[in-house]
Amino acid sequence: MRYVTCNNRKYRWPDKPVVVICLDGSEPGYPLSDGGGYIDRAIENGQMPYLASIKNRGLFRTADATIPSFTNPNNISIVTGTPPVVHGISGNFFYDLGSDAEVMMNDPAFLRVGTIFKAFQDQGARIAIITAKDKLRRMLGHELDFEQGSAICFSAEKCQLTTRGEHGIDDASQLTDLPTPDVYSGALSEYVFSAGLTLLDTWSPDILYLSTSDYIQHKHGPGTPTADAFYGMIDHHLLEMQAHDAVIAVTADHGMKAKHDSAGQPNIVYLKPLINELLPSDRFRIILPITDPYVVHHGALGGFATIYLADPADVQPVCHKLSAQKGIELVLEASIACERFSLPPDRVGHIVVTSSTEWVLGHSQQYHDLSTLSEPLRSHGGLSEQRVPFILNYPAPLLVASTTLRNYDIFDAALNHTTD
């Protein structure tokens, strides 16, 4: 048996194509789920017959995502098989102490370990990666050699701009008959699946990784017509992939919850005015790690925040103040949060805050443009969005009763645990 080692985990060499899918924002069905979960409701409504069939012959359960339950840390956990304390990506956005600047965490320079893709390419595997948003692309494709013709990595967002030297393929928009998708649409994810299926047909990757957008999930709850149609599209493509005798593994980077009141107004805890009751603004810095270029999705409002203080002596008073606030679930000193959530201590600040299920955390009213929110707010980032799907189209007997699964166990499950 041939194995590849990456970050102290051994992975069996695939004997058939392995397709791992991160369905961004795919809230699963479980007792505390929002609306019964996207996949589960779509199955109930007859929109996902292929995944319905997997319930009886594969693995169909849930797992825990990494906290914060955001896109970047969880995608990188999935593709490295490690938590953030190992790979270093603590959010979509952070305060870089070295440069004294607030920056997007999109640069591969922030990565502290290699990816499963790189480890397999080094041993001769063919790797294909398609992500919806370009913000992830460089990190997912970090250190891959595109010149040798055994790796492809591009985003649906910028598919028409790809080159062989940078992405392993020229003009990836030609892979399908679909028009170049709008980044603020479900079509962005449909393109990911369609192009992935084309690569399975024509390029024969050993490992195919698909990472979608959560635009639909931010706008539409489980079981709604738009959500069901979106998941029906996914089911159709999964069935086509099954025809290639592929191992298909599905998980998510985070769930998604409604964050608004009965009138549709967002439930927001603004942190700055609360802390200003104790400290002047130049004595603290609030970081909202959900922040990314796609504010139409969420308005930079999520369930997780970190706070940097000029004087560590202020930690306890600030923690006490925030802990008493409605809408806040946890307020932790950084050392405790890093141990509990396996976060890199140098990228977290002094205090970590998570919101309650129906609430989000904001900076101040002036900081957020709520006019970008065309529907009642749905978002993620906290503990209430940690549960995600964990689905395999082949049996995995050893995982059926496993008490603890993480979304970053999905490559281990697909490569090491599936049986015919």
Question: Where is each model-derived feature located?
Answer:
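Active-site neighborhoods of enzymes that stabilize oxyanions during catalysis
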Residues: 289-419
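Short catalytic/ligand-binding loop motif for oxyanion handling, primarily in non-cytosolic enzymes
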Residues: 28-30, 71, 87, 135-141, ...
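Acidic/histidine-rich catalytic neighborhood
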Residues: 239, 256-306
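His/Asp/Glu-rich, glycine-adjacent segments
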Residues: 81-221, 297, 303, 309, ...
